[in-house]
Amino acid sequence: PLFLEASTGLNDDLNGVERKVTFDIRDSGIEAQVVQSLAKWKRQALKDYGFRVGKGLYCDMNAIRRDEELDNLHSVYVDQWDWEKVIREEDRTEAYLKNVVRSIVSAVCATEMNLHAMFPQLQDLPLHTPNVTFITTQELEDKYPDLTPKERENAIVKENGTTFLMKIGAPLRSGKPHDGRAPDYDDLS
């Protein structure tokens, strides 16, 4: 969806401080909000459409984030591909998460290889490897204590290539979080 009824509570609070773009729909008197993220909406859709364990959905979200900190990677307008799948309670583990990440990276690498084979003009571009470095934000801060969180991310990727950063919103020993997270659904464990 491009917008949601405000009363559903399905629009993402992101870090809990970003203001939503809100407007009224004249003929219905409903207050609506332009989506900031589909995180909660995806989970509700999985339930509403009866997705089974191991199955999921993907979506192409177009959002407006009026309070986004703008830079060369971030804009007020967001076009984001995302996915969500149903898992069992006992699969809510770090090991399961890492296996899912590895399977996604493997699929991306296989797609990249196929594109290289199909389009000779891509031959000069390097291929990514399916190796993933997993690191928590605390481990990252310990490794690069004098860098900002964003500089740490850049440094670890330069050093290791494909990197999966874990526990992004958890408090660090320095007393500063690596980055903000939605207070009402992000799971830091």
Feature locations, PLM:
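Structured aminoacyl-transfer and RNA-binding surfaces used for tRNA recognition/handling
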Residues: 1-189
